[in-house]
Each structure stands twice: as C-alpha cells, then as structure tokens.
Amino acid sequence: MELAYLVRLLEHNKFERTNLPLSSPLVVHGIAGSGKSTILTTFHHHYPAHPIFSHSPTLLDPSNRIYQQCITTDSVPDGAIVDEYNYKALDYSRCLALFGDPLQLPHSLQPHYYSSRTHRYGPKLTSLLNDLFHLSITSLAPVDSLDYADPFAVDPSGFTIADEEVYNFVSQQVPGTLLPLDTVGLEYSSVSFYCSDLRHCVVLRPLSSLHGSHPRQGQPHHFRFLCQV
C-alpha cells in the first residue's frame, strides 16, 4: 500500500518510469527542483511511521516541523526512505525507497523512476548545464540570471562555493565558502561559484562541478547565478 501510494506521487509529479524491473528498494533519481522534497513530505504526512533519513538532513516541512533523520551508523531501519542515498554507499536493501540526485553524487544505482525536469533552474543555467554535461534538463522556471565576472574586480553575491583548486584562496577572502560536495541537499537562491577552469574542473570532478570558460590556470574565475527555490 505504501509503495503504491509512493508510485502515484511520482507519476503525479511527472517522474518517468525506466525499463528497470521493479525491485526493492525503489530507486528514484531527480535533479534539483524536480519535486523530490515535495514527494517525501506528502508521503510522510500519509505514512509517518516510515522515517525519512538523509546523510545531510534538512527541514522538509517548516509549518509542521518535519525533519529528516540523520544516518549515524551503517545500519538503516527496515522500511526507511533515504534521501541523498548516493552520498555514501551503504546496505540499503531493507529500505522502502531511495531518493538521489545523480548529477551531484557518486554511488548511484540504476533508477526505477527519474525526472530531468526542474522548477529551480531557469533557462540560462539549464542551457549551461546541458552543454557542459551533455544532459537533457527541461527548465520549468520562468527566469534566472547568469553572470560571468572578474573575480578580482567584482564581489561575490549570495552564497559562495569554490572548487578545490581555488578553495584555499577564495575561503581566505570570503569566510563561509564551501566546497561543492559540502552543499549537497542545501538550497540557495543566489550563488557565486569560483574555479580556475570550469571545463577542466568538470572533467576532473564531473559530479560536483558546474561550468565556466577558460581563464589562466590557477587564477579563480567567478560566475554568479540566481534561480528559483
């Protein structure tokens, strides 16, 4: 009954069925903004006995104070749902379902359902990601903003993320700067991202990088984008 309800939620939110035969646990992949959190929140309202775990827990429903639970051991309870499961390879065989974003993290399994539709990334960022990663993301957001800037002339706006190659330099200038993998499961409406060479960065770390042009190696390059949350 619980699994049937979860499948109805996935289909209602336009998640597509793959050719992989259904098995346990159910594996669901969706990019950021595809509706994973909405599905998890709705499911939890109907079946609160099924805990929702994550390696980086977030607040699912502020009005009802519904939090994800943190995975603190290598053992996950029977019937649990795990969000961002691919953050760490564990034995998830007793879980009801696994949710993850295959663009952000390794350890991904073959999915039973997936969605490449996003309400978060606007047309500009979507075009950028499709070009970089050879994807087919469909943007449902009305508008976004993407700017390339001189890192030595323009201050960052919003939240600051830096690739490993320039992280030490940027974090000294901008306290609170995070590495890409430290932002898994988090949402920001405005982000400044720094790297030395984004296309080179994508080749080396394809699951934790975005896009860029080709500045001099070792010199940080800065771009900013605004998106829906």
Where are these regions (language model features)?
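The feature marks helicase ATPase cores and/or their adjacent C-terminal helical subdomains
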Residues: M1-V229
